[in-house]
Amino acid sequence: YHLGAGVEVPLLHFPLLEKTGIVKEGFTTRLGGVSEGIFSTMNLSFTRGDEEEAVRENYRRLASALDVDYDKFVFTDQTHTTNVRKVTAEDAGKGIVKERDYTDIDGLITNEPGLVLSTFYADCVPLYFVDPVHRAIGMSHSGWKGTVGKMGAATITAMKREFGTEAKDLVC
């Protein structure tokens, strides 16, 4: 990985994923936001007690750093499952500007350009999947339960079912 430079919000980038040319990606740090106190500064959680407007501003800054639309984020609803959801243009903004109409989702997959798949981590593992052949992507959250439950395999299986993805073609 490498740390992006010259932006308000520092992001870790993964060159292997960038080289595919079909995905913008970034892994946030705690830097570059407006949250204060124990949430300082780049808090991206609406569920931990931070000021909602501060979290929204943090997402605006993140969207700017990624050069994506703020209302295109799509959030998981992580509960340490192996559930994967295909998201479409109708899901844009769910979790940030619209209510989610789903629960218990630890992985997201899409072939819809412009959507920003968003997963969250503390001590769990981020899983990134890029299928350059079918121009599809996936992101999954895998804690110990997801790892034991084979979250990576569940995500690949969902991508194969929905997009025809073959594991041999994936950049992870």
Range-by-range predicted roles:
Residues 1-14:
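Short, Gly/Pro- and small/polar-rich lid/capping loops
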Residues 6, 20-25, 39, 71, ...:
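Sequence-level motif detector for i,i+2 pairs with an aromatic at +2
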Residues 52-142:
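Phosphate-centric recognition/catalysis
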Residues 11, 44, 109:
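Short clusters of hydrophobic/aromatic residues that line enzyme substrate/ligand-binding pockets
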Residues 3, 24, 114-116, 124, ...:
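Surface-exposed, charge/polar-rich loops and edge strands
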Residues 36, 83-85, 146-149:
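Short acidic/glycine-rich loop or secondary-structure boundary segments that cap or lie
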Residues 15-19, 64-67, 164:
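A general structural signal for short secondary-structure junctions and capping/turn motifs
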Residues 16, 20-61:
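Intrinsically disordered, low-complexity, positively charged segments
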